[in-house]
């Protein structure tokens, strides 16, 4: 999360229009689920974190980040708040649950509705992940289309990445993580568009 990437090239940036704000996601995820595992360790999910993300964008603007054991991020000096893309779910974070569980499937519906209101009414650019607008029930898992030996390397790398989370550290759970190269992993991640008609209450929100 480097704020300077939003600056024009003559100021050392890449002239980007917007950037993910993982800090908002992480703070919200901890607030909703109470989970502070893996790279969520440095977040408390308190109201002040969420307010700071709405006011300033990145929470980490050069402070020490315990999980990475080094400073994280840089300031967003002079950048408009809408340059931060805020989200409760995206392809990375849903897939990083290992089994591809969507946030609304394991947190309080009341809290999830409140978090959605904060997301949509905040000054940043909100992102709704595929199917989030109608509470899609399908999982979204990490998938890739590689030939051997890269396919096995990616699968093993995925297991190693997930070991940072205590809930995925056991061998039994590791074995349950879907193979990214299996076509079924991709197919199970596709939306059931009929849910738009079945979940009309979610669309009304």
Say what each PLM segment does.
Residues 176-205:
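Aromatic- and carboxylate-lined catalytic core of secreted/periplasmic carbohydrate-active enzymes
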Residues 1-171, 183-186:
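Conserved alpha/beta catalytic core and glycan-binding cleft of carbohydrate-active enzymes
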């Amino acid at each position: 999360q480097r704020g300077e990437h939003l600056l024009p090239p003559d100021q050392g940036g890449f002239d980007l229009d917007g950037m993910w704000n993982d800090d908002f996601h992480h703070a919200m995820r901890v607030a909703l689920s109470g989970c502070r595992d893996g790279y969520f360790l440095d977040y408390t999910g308190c109201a002040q974190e969420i307010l700071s993300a709405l006011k300033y964008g990145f929470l980490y603007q050069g402070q020490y980040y315990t999980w990475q054991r080094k400073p994280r991020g840089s300031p967003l000096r002079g950048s408009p708040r809408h340059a931060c893309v805020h989200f409760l779910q995206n392809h990375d974070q849903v897939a990083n649950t290992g089994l591809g569980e969507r946030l609304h499937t394991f947190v309080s519906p009341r809290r999830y509705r409140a978090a959605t209101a904060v997301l949509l009414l905040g000054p940043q650019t909100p992102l709704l992940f595929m199917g989030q607008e109608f509470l899609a029930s399908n999982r979204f898992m990490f998938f890739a289309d590689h030939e051997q030996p890269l396919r096995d390397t990616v699968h093993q790398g995925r297991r190693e990445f997930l070991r940072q989370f205590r809930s995925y550290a056991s061998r039994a759970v590791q074995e349950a993580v879907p193979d990214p190269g299996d076509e079924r992993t991709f197919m199970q991640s596709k939306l059931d568009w009929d849910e738009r008609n079945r979940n009309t209450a979610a669309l009304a929100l």
